[in-house]
């Protein structure tokens, strides 16, 4: 089993996509990259943390390359601290890696993707230093709240787009 931690906008959206993938064992939403012991309120007030999803996966069933490819399909890696209507540093595009092999793979992936994108990719790559699990009510938010307004307006269409190819 391996882990990768990704930030690409609202963590509810990112988690909703990855928790459905074959080979993904578990997902957990949290915060990384800012002040210690964050809360949702402190993150929204700009404490420097990023909304992230920790993805625990079986590399025999799904590769990191496949995960990163999907990650770039579900968010805009050329947008600085903004995804759709969600604006702020907590929504930045970032890949937090745990080992050098994953760092190199992520760097090579972004280099290849830059050949496809007309705008500059701004996704950061950084070693995971600290990770804080988000509050329980954020975990598996779409599964637990499929009829909530944000879920219907933002997450459900994103899932439909991914499922339709």
Curated annotation (Swiss-Prot):
Domain of life, per lineage: Bacteria
Catalytic residue list: 10
Keywords, alphabetical: Oxidoreductase
Molecular function terms, GO-annotated: L-methionine:thioredoxin-disulfide S-oxidoreductase activity; peptide-methionine (S)-S-oxide reductase activity
GO biological process, one term: protein modification process
Xref: SUPFAM superfamilies: Peptide methionine sulfoxide reductase
Catalytic activity reported: L-methionyl-[protein] + [thioredoxin]-disulfide + H2O = L-methionyl-(S)-S-oxide-[protein] + [thioredoxin]-dithiol; [thioredoxin]-disulfide + L-methionine + H2O = L-methionine (S)-S-oxide + [thioredoxin]-dithiol
Entry similarity comment: Belongs to the MsrA Met sulfoxide reductase family.
Membrane-spanning intervals of the chain: none
Entry function: Has an important function as a repair enzyme for proteins that have been inactivated by oxidation. Catalyzes the reversible oxidation-reduction of methionine sulfoxide in proteins to methionine.
InterPro entries reported for this sequence: Met_Sox_Rdtase_MsrA_dom, Met_Sox_Rdtase_MsrA_sf
EC number: 1.8.4.11
Protein name, per record: Peptide methionine sulfoxide reductase MsrA
């Amino acid at each position: 089993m391996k882990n990768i931690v990704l930030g690409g906008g609202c963590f509810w959206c990112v988690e909703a996509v990855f928790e459905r993938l074959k080979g993904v064992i578990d997902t957990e939403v949290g915060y990384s990259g800012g002040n210690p012991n964050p809360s949702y309120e402190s993150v929204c007030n700009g404490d420097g943390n990023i909304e992230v999803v920790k993805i625990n996966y079986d590399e025999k069933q799904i590769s990191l390359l496949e995960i990163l490819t999907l990650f770039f399909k579900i968010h805009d890696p050329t947008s600085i601290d903004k995804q759709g209507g969600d604006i702020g540093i907590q929504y930045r595009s970032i890949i937090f890696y745990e080992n050098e092999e994953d760092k190199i793979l992520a760097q090579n992936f972004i280099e290849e993707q830059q050949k496809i994108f007309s705008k500059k990719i701004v996704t950061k790559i950084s070693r995971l230093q600290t990770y804080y699990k988000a509050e329980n009510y954020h975990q598996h938010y779409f599964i637990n709240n499929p009829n909530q307004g944000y879920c219907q307006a933002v997450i459900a269409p994103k899932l439909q787009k991914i499922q339709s190819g």
